Every structure is written in C-alpha cells, then in structure tokens.
C-alpha cells in the first residue's frame, strides 16, 4: 500500500515539482526510502530530465541511455556519469568511448532544431543502439519553471529516425501546471509521423512537424479557454436594477 502511494504521488508530480512532492511524502509518514529512490529514478527517466555535466554541457537521462551500475551515458558528448536523483546533479563524469558515434550531419541538424525552435532551456540527446540498423532515437526537452508566478511546464519531443526506411516517428508531449487560485493541469501529446527523403532534410522535416503540433495545441488551448473554462465560471445573477455608481465607494458589507 505504501509503495503504491509513493508510486502514484511521484509519478503524477508536475514538471519541476517532484522534489517538493518527495518532501511532502516524507512529511506524511511515507518512509520507504528504497521505493522513493526507485520511483525518483523512473520519474526522471520517463520524463527525460536533464542534468549538467559541466558548466556548458547538459545531457538527458532515459532508460535508453542507462548503463549498468546506475550510470548513464551521452552518445554525442561521449561521456558517462552517475546521478543524485534528489539534487539532480551529475557525478563521477568520465569519458565513454564504447558507444557508437553519432554522425556529425545528424548532430548538427538536431542542434539547429534546438537553437532555432526552442525558446526556453533546451537539451537534446541522440541514441543509436546498433551498428546494423541505421536508426536513431532523438530526444528534445525544453523546460521552464516559474513558481513565483505559479506555473511550471515542459515540452518533450521523442522520435525515431530510420534512415533506410526514410521514416520519422514518435510523439511530442506537453505538460503544464498552473496553480494560482486554482489547480489546472495540461498533459497532452501528439503523434509524429513523417517521411525524410534524405538525412540532409531531417532539420526541415522535424521543424515543420513540431511547428504543426504547436499550432494544433494553440488552437485547442484557445478553444479550451473560450469555451470550457467559461462554463466553469460562476455566472453573476441578473437583478435588472440600476446601480448608483457614485455611492459604490461608500458601500459596506453587512456583518452576518
């Protein structure tokens, strides 16, 4: 029962708020530290959290780039590292040359997508598991945390590019939590499916697909605000009486 509660509470944590959730879990007496550590690891892997391994280098963590002994690696930077899941700090950073080298042409195009189309803090990773198949897992993550204004959010693009099949397939995910005078959650995703005739067109295709997904989210959010949220607002009563606005400043609520 305790492990299930820990799983659900951590799993449903909004972007940028999981540490506060863990703090609250301990405050209410859930003290299975092994379960907390395991769920923290899975949370950061599943939502592709990023960590800094140097002053100017950030990497993504996932189940796909995990090594034995609780280590992870970045195929582009050719580095491996461990992680403190509570502080989200990379530790024991080492060179790692055993992974397959990612072609420069692909790295340059994904870097360009990140720099041209992501306004907030963005990190990317590219993973290739086999020399036999020209297939690359591409992960782009952009997060923006603004707790002073009561909102946090993240955008993730996870797709697979198969060179021989000329296919780009995956999903883009958006998760936003707004909690000023309420508690509004947005957790949605859209499929990615496109043809990439040649590797040199990867930037163009991925940028076009992501722009289309963003526009579809914008349309849906506009509709949500104009229709669904309006239905939730309390309708003021119609009294059909005129108000003497000059005397409004002198009105006081009667004690009840």
From Swiss-Prot:
Residues spanning the signal sequence: none
Modified residues (Phosphoserine): 31
Gene3D superfamilies: F-actin capping protein, alpha subunit, F-actin capping protein, beta subunit
Function summary: F-actin-capping proteins bind in a Ca(2+)-independent manner to the fast growing ends of actin filaments (barbed end) thereby blocking the exchange of subunits at these ends. Unlike other capping proteins (such as gelsolin and severin), these proteins do not sever actin filaments. Competes with formin cdc12 for attachment to the actin filaments barbed ends. Slowly replaces cdc12 on the barbed ends in preparation for filament disassembly during contractile ring constriction.
Entry superkingdom: Eukaryota
InterPro entries, A to Z: CapZ_alpha, CapZ_alpha/beta, CapZ_alpha/beta_2, CapZ_alpha_1, F-actin_cap_asu_CS
Principal place of residence: cytoplasm
Subunit comment: Component of the F-actin capping complex, composed of a heterodimer of an alpha and a beta subunit.
Family statement drawn from the similarity comment of this UniProt entry: Belongs to the F-actin-capping protein alpha subunit family.
Protein name listed in UniProt: F-actin-capping protein subunit alpha
GO biological process: actin cortical patch organization; actin cytoskeleton organization; barbed-end actin filament capping; mating projection actin fusion focus assembly; mitotic actomyosin contractile ring assembly; mitotic actomyosin contractile ring contraction
Compartment list: Cytoplasm; Cytoplasm, Cytoskeleton, Actin patch; Cytoplasm, Cytoskeleton
Record GO terms (molecular function): actin filament binding
Keyword flag Secreted: no
One Pfam family here: F-actin_cap_A
Keyword terms of this UniProt record: Actin capping, Actin-binding, Cytoplasm, Cytoskeleton, Phosphoprotein
Coiled coil: none
GO CC terms, sorted: actin cortical patch; cell division site; cell tip; cortical cytoskeleton; F-actin capping protein complex
PANTHER family referenced in this protein's UniProt entry, alphabetically: F-ACTIN-CAPPING PROTEIN SUBUNIT ALPHA
Keyword Phosphoprotein: yes
């Amino acid at each position: 029962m305790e492990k299930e509660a820990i799983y659900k509470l951590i799993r449903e944590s909004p972007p940028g708020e999981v540490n506060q959730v863990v703090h609250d879990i301990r405050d209410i007496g859930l003290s299975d530290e092994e379960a907390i550590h395991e769920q923290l690891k899975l949370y950061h892997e599943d939502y592709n959290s990023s960590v800094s391994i140097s002053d100017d280098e950030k990497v993504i963590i996932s189940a796909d780039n995990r090594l034995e002994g609780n280590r992870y690696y970045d195929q582009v930077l050719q580095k491996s590292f461990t992680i403190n899941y509570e502080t989200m700090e990379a530790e024991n950073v080492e060179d790692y040359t055993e992974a397959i080298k990612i072609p420069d042409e692909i790295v340059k195009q994904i870097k360009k997508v990140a720099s041209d189309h992501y306004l907030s803090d963005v990190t990317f990773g590219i993973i290739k598991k086999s020399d036999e198949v020209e297939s690359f897992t591409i992960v782009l993550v952009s997060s923006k945390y603004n707790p002073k204004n009561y909102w946090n959010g993240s955008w993730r693009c996870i797709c697979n590019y198969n060179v021989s099949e000329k296919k780009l397939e995956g999903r883009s995910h958006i998760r936003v939590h707004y909690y000023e005078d309420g508690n509004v959650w947005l957790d949605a995703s859209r499929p990615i499916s496109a043809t990439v005739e040649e590797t040199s067109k990867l930037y163009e295709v991925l940028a076009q697909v992501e722009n289309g997904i963003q526009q579809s989210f914008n349309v849906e959010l506009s509709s949500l605000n104009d229709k669904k949220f309006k239905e939730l607002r309390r309708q003021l009563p119609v009294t059909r009486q005129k108000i003497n606005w000059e005397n409004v400043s002198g009105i006081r609520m009667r004690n009840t």
